[in-house]
Amino acid sequence: MTPILTTSLPLPLHSQGKVRDTYRLSDRELLMVATDRISAFDVVLPTPIPEKGRVLNQLSLAWFRETAGLVRNHLAPDLSIPTSVLSEQPDLEQRSMRVVMAEPILFECVVRGYISGSGWKDYQRSGSIAGERLPGGLRESDRLPEPVFTPATKATSGHDENISPAELAHRTGRELAQTLERLSLSLYGFAAERALQSGLILADTKFEFGFHGGDVILIDELLTPDSSRFWDAQRYRPGGPQPSFDKQFVRDYLEQVGWNKQPPAPPLPDEVVEGTSVRYLEALRRLGPAGPREPRGVRSERLRRHVPS
């Protein structure tokens, strides 16, 4: 299947993000379309990942439905997409999500259940994450005593900035900050248990919220390989990096080639593209309502080739 880098629908373009093109359906609703673009270190890469947008959209839809009892989200009451909108690009249907308009809260709500990524780097430097002191002697990928809420600014350009919960409260007000932390920790706890039932560890994840009708609701994407770290529970061995089903594979490659993390980003080689696509499809197979449409033998062979045991 040909990867999709850009879209062009007969609707007003509301915004274009790193991955999604968002169109205005009406004064109250938007259509979010997930492309195959991929970003790393806050920079969009020139090479698309086939099927990635479909995986992101299908997983987000499934998680939004499954967590609706915990927190309201931006899914529209009617999720059907007018036939005329996709008549020229019918392959976008599984990549499209109809949502209500909300006012974004411009902070990312990150929850870490395990110490990895930037959290591990912060701990090595200071013994803490987001200003919260952690026990000494932790190894990379260790499970934390309790999940930690580590918010970050949401930069329109450039790199996001990690901040402490206290700084979040200073910027948003104490009541809103407490609401964001409570909802984020509740969602993480639910999703971590659900992922483990599918053989995956939810190491950390990012939530985004907005205001709609005076309420705080979940927006953007939810518990996807773009916004989360998913590890294979059967192969979990703390003390170093873990085999994962997310875009860490791309980050690792970019670190290896010595990219300075400033645009333009280098192109990805074919083996990294296919390896990333395989990881995303495996996450969908395990977590989503319907897995990738390929025979199990083909999937297993591709998985063995790119995610060795």
Regions found by a protein language model. Give the residues of each.
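A long amphipathic alpha-helix within ATP-dependent nucleotide-binding catalytic cores
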Residues: 172-203
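Hydrophobic/aromatic-rich, well-ordered segments within soluble, folded domains that form packed cores
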Residues: 13, 21-25, 200-203, 207, ...
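Conserved metal-phosphate-binding beta-hairpin within the catalytic cores
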Residues: 111, 202-222
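A short mid-domain helix/strand-loop element embedded in enzyme catalytic domains
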Residues: 143-174
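C-terminal helix-cap and adjacent tail motif
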Residues: 222-287
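Active-site loop/lid in soluble adenylation, ligation, and acyl-transfer enzymes
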Residues: 1-152, 261-267, 271-308
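Catalytic cores of nucleic-acid ligases and guanylyltransferases
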Residues: 35, 91, 190, 217-225
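Generic recognition of stable, solvent-exposed alpha-helical segments in well-folded globular domains
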Residues: 54, 58, 175, 179-182, ...
